[in-house]
Amino acid sequence: MRFTKMEALGNDFVVLDGIRQRLHLTPETIRTLADRRRGVGCDQLLIAEPPAHIAADVRYRIFNADGTEVEHCGNGVRCLARFLVDEGLAAPGVLRIETDGRITEAEPRDDGQVSVDMGPPELEPARIPFQAPVRQEAYRLATSRGEQTIGAVSMGNPHAVLRVDDMTGAPVAELGPEIERHPRFPRRVNVGFMEVCTRDRIRLRVFERGVGETPACGTGACAAVVAGRLRDWLDAPVTVELTGGVLVIHWLGPGRSVWMTGPARTVFRGEIELPASAAATPRGPTR
């Protein structure tokens, strides 16, 4: 099976073409592909497929390294947009990418950056999903380290955002996995630890659901800026400094789309031998 290895700010992906071929992948196969010793190695696996929605150019699916499917990935959608153009699967320009019932617009640029309309954030607790009686700008969450104040935001996937004084010393390893599986988040949650440096710059670490801490998380950066803007800590746009690099996030307020701009690049292409049950077969015309 042919694959493309890509990265965005150190968040790495195995990308598969499911447009020209049908892929038959089990969770076990996905875990093997993601394994850095037995497979290719990645934080997440991305599959490009023919769209189900007539308004979309392509559909993509996202799988964590543990084999679970998730709703959205900001760094992943930038890599996918770059992959589609580089592989000749889409013409340069604005691409309409379908995932989990929503369509995201992405535009690969000549300078290596990709701008993405991530859509408006979801703030209603039931739709995040998060267990709370009413919508608030901040919530109190009981943890083993005492009550924590969080922002709860969905960017197509759920995020909890905590403000910390110093990103470097943030309790990511301790609170990340605990909050990820907190019972008030029924589908688990990504956890961001945000240091506000100025009104237009933050530093951020993210413990990703089903993955652990990663060098960067695009939806996490969007969620952090939304949470910070709702608390009047930030202006627009905001430069987000992550371990893997920098994203620029622009959000003008409730009901408006969040725009994310950042890099995406191909690292290498290759082939891997997989069990016969995971074989790819040619796909006929889709439209």
UniProtKB/Swiss-Prot annotation:
The keyword Amino-acid biosynthesis applies. Its main location: cytoplasm. It catalyses: (2S,6S)-2,6-diaminopimelate = meso-2,6-diaminopimelate. The active site is at 73 (proton donor), 217 (proton acceptor). Transmembrane segments: none annotated. Belongs to the diaminopimelate epimerase family. This is Diaminopimelate epimerase.
